[in-house]
Amino acid sequence: MDQNIFVIGQGGREHAIAWKLSKSNKVDNVYVCPGNGGTSLEENIINVDINIEDKDSLINFAKNNNIIMTIVGPEGPLVDGIVNSFIENGLKIFGPTKEYAILEGSKVFSKEFMEKFDIPTSSFRMFSDNIEAKNYIKNKKYPIVVKADGLAAGKGVIISNDEDEAINAIDKLLDSNHSEYIVIEDFLIGQELSAIYICNFKGASYEIGLPWTKDYKSRDEFNSGPNTGGMGAVSHPLGYQHKNLLFKLHLEIEKILIKTIAAINNYNKKTNKNYLGFLYIGLMINNDNDIKVLEYNCRLGDPETQNLMLTLENQNIDLYDLIVNDPINSIKDFNLLKIDTEESSYC
């Protein structure tokens, strides 16, 4: 019987995931729904013309095509509960349930989650009332950041350099019904970093750290223009800093990860659900090398995935073993598994 993988999504991220899985000698075909022009040209990768919001059709496809694992690329289906639906139908799927996807799906939930579990983040306030929000920004030190509560494909974050810009941001995100709530938070200055993990936080718990990356969200040169979902990315973004500094940063990021895992495990008790999937922690490192969390995502970054899959390929690490098999049992000397985080790539 064929061993086929089903990847949901249509971007460069999904192309990179499918490309890496297609390199595995344990996989016959990788189906991508809906895929793109690039995936249509790859060997052993087949595009599937199904609307990714049509859960019933996706489930039927997985049942009828020897799909041993489905991998969800974008955040929308995760927040919409695609993982819950697949599990209810006895299908294997890699991604957190909607109970956890709210970490990405709601900025309000995410910031309150960080505050409750003492995870370092910028100071913030949330608002549903236009007038209250505009009164609050009158005495703020600029720049500030105004964020839509819900998903916005990377475009629901507006950096405001003065009160007029902040008022326009509030009007755009709140008054236009783009979001029922907004978050207004202090602007952080420093180096951004994406720390991404492959996680299973229940039972045989583990997390596998992937190389650090940095994406560039601004549309225009010199970090200017409106935010996008990501214009490009580099891995090993801190360059060849002094080893003592890198060691310190590793320790600090590890502390944040440990707090995050503890918080998720605490949440496990309420949801009785397993967090299985990717965990993306967006970080900011300031000039004093203090680290704060900007955001959580419950999937791989786009475009960072292109860097990550190339790194895994260069190091002969099979993505199949990391996410389709139970890596603890399928990878010999799992505890010695070490992905070289200093290999550089860019896209």
Predicted segments with their positions:
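ATP-binding N-terminal substructure of ATP-dependent carboxylate-amine bond-forming enzymes
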Residues: M1-K98
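General beta-strand structural signal in soluble alpha/beta enzymes
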Residues: V7, V32-C33, I71-V72, I93-P96, ...
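Short, charged, surface-exposed secondary-structure boundary motifs
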Residues: L41-E43, I102-V108, D220-E221
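Short acidic-hydrophobic, aromatic-tinged amphipathic segments that line or gate anion-handling sites
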Residues: N47-E53, R125-D129, S160
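A conserved helix-loop-beta module that forms one wall/lid of the active-site cleft
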Residues: F94-G156
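Internal nucleotide-binding/catalytic subdomain
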Residues: G156-P303
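Active-site loop ensemble at the mouth of alpha/beta enzyme cores that anchors a bound cofactor
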Residues: D290-L322
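A glycine-rich beta-turn/hairpin centered on an aromatic-Pro dipeptide
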Residues: N325-C347
